[in-house]
Swiss-Prot record:
PANTHER family: PALMITOYLTRANSFERASE APP, ZINC FINGER DHHC DOMAIN CONTAINING PROTEIN
EC number: 2.3.1.225
Protein's recorded name: Probable protein S-acyltransferase 6
Superkingdom as given in the UniProt entry: Eukaryota
Phosphoserine modification, residue list: S325
Active site: C177
Residue ranges annotated for the DHHC domain, each copy included: 147-197
InterPro entries named among the record's database cross-references: Palmitoyltrfase_DHHC, PFA4/ZDH16/20/ERF2-like
Originating organism: Arabidopsis thaliana
Function description: Palmitoyl acyltransferase.
Membership in a protein family: Belongs to the DHHC palmitoyltransferase family.
Region described as Disordered: spans on this chain: 108-129
Length: 410
């Protein structure tokens, strides 16, 4: 009998050479060694950047540069300068929204201690601890119901929800935005709204000066508005593009202005039907805006660059014959993902006396379901009953009846 040790991974020299982001169990993507955290759909961020930069580039080349001839030097340069600065500001807000911790709550490595017992209290009946699915907590004199998250193994705070895309519980979860590739929540909602609002203003700015350029062509050449539009196809394309974009991002801005004024999140707005009196988070319009834009942003609960000890593998079992159950790893994954892992581990014996008796650790109830006598024959702590006068190392031979029956079936 010997102990099977798990294989060691190469490339790691010490027990504390991993950082938090390297052992992260969520679906996030990290950049620059954990300095930036994105959602798993971060590739869409490139599309969003191109949808902002490309129209502004076309505007500066084909519209703003031509307007410099119609305005004085200072005004002509300022048209391009404002567009460039506004675009840079918009991209900074985009990165502040997408590349920071939105308010992820660190998951527990073990579930909390159960507080209730499920089961009969009669004699001979085992009591099974079970966590309540919902608990009531009091925050600032108000009672909230919090739910237990099987994946993160914690009770979610009020206004917290589990993002199925990032696989994290996030504080004051608003929604997961695929355009920025990140959850929108407590720590980046302010920047998200400013990004959407500034994008709306940028679209209006480009739309307005494209119209001004068409008007300048019409007045300078004394032609109809239609002919003036045909002389600058770039302006027509930008007008159509910015009009459609303003319809979407402008509508999103108005929607979030309503949410801020009532202190709601997108998740709460679609899931619950609050009125003015039932919303426990509504503090009034002024205080609601102060909470979003002027309250300090809480620090992150995660230090993604902190050094952590490497997680120890499953404790080595005393195994005979060098066999470990292949389901052990699957059971760990089931526990981490919040699923109930059901598996049985088998230990094979290889004694020195030549007997190869397999011993299975299974549930007695499962054995009784197979056969009432199975639980008495196969048990982790019992051996097959032998006659008292039977030698331990004797060979057990099949009776002639059994041999005949097996030969007939063959």
């Amino acid at each position: 009998m010997y102990v099977v040790t798990p294989p060691q991974r190469s490339g790691f020299g010490s027990d504390c050479d991993l950082r938090v982001y390297q052992t992260w169990k969520g679906s996030n993507i990290f950049c620059l060694q954990g300095r930036f955290i994105f959602g798993p759909d971060v590739r869409s961020l490139g599309l969003t950047i191109s949808l902002i930069v490309a129209p502004v580039t076309i505007f500066c080349i084909f519209v703003a540069s031509k307007l410099m001839d119609d305005f004085s030097d200072s005004w002509g340069v300022s048209i391009i300068l404002v567009a460039v600065v506004f675009t840079i500001y918009d991209l900074i807000l985009l990165m502040l929204t997408s590349g920071r911790d939105p308010g992820i709550i660190p998951r527990n490595s073990h579930p909390p201690e159960p507080e209730v017992v499920d089961g009969n209290t009669g004699s001979g009946t085992s009591q099974t601890p079970r966590l309540p699915r919902v608990k009531e907590v009091e925050v600032n004199g108000k009672v909230f119901k919090v739910k237990y998250c099987d994946t993160c193994m914690l009770y979610r705070p009020p206004r917290c929800s589990h993002c199925s895309i990032c696989n994290n519980c996030v504080e004051r979860f608003d929604h997961h935005c695929p355009w920025v590739g990140q959850c929108i929540a407590q720590r980046n909602y302010r920047f998200f709204f400013m990004f959407v609002f500034s994008t709306t203003l940028l679209c209006v700015y480009v739309f307005a000066f494209c119209c001004v350029y068409i008007k300048k062509i019409k007045e300078s050449e004394d032609i109809s508005i239609l002919k003036a539009m045909l002389k600058t196809p770039a302006s027509i394309a930008l007008i159509l593009y910015t009009f459609i974009s303003t319809f979407f991002v402008g509508g999103l801005t108005c929607f979030h202005l309503y949410l801020i004024s009532t202190n709601q999140t997108t998740y709460e707005n679609f899931r619950y039907s609050y009125d003015r009196h039932s919303n426990p988070h509504n503090k009034g319009v002024v205080d609601n805006f102060k909470e979003i834009f002027f309250s300090p942003i809480p620090p992150s609960k995660n230090n993604f660059r902190a050094m952590v000890p490497r997680e120890n593998p499953m404790p080595s079992r005393s195994v005979v014959g060098g066999f470990m159950s292949p389901n052990m790893g699957k059971a760990n994954d089931d526990i981490e993902m919040g699923r109930k892992g059901v598996w049985a581990m088998a230990e094979h014996g290889d004694g020195k006396d030549g007997n190869n008796n397999e011993r299975f650790h299974v549930n007695d109830n499962e054995l009784n379901e197979l056969s009432p006598d199975m639980g008495n024959i196969v048990n982790g702590d019992e051996q097959i009953n032998r006659p008292n006068n039977h030698p331990r190392n004797a060979n057990w031979e099949m009776s002639p009846e059994v041999m005949a029956l097996s030969a007939r079936r063959a």
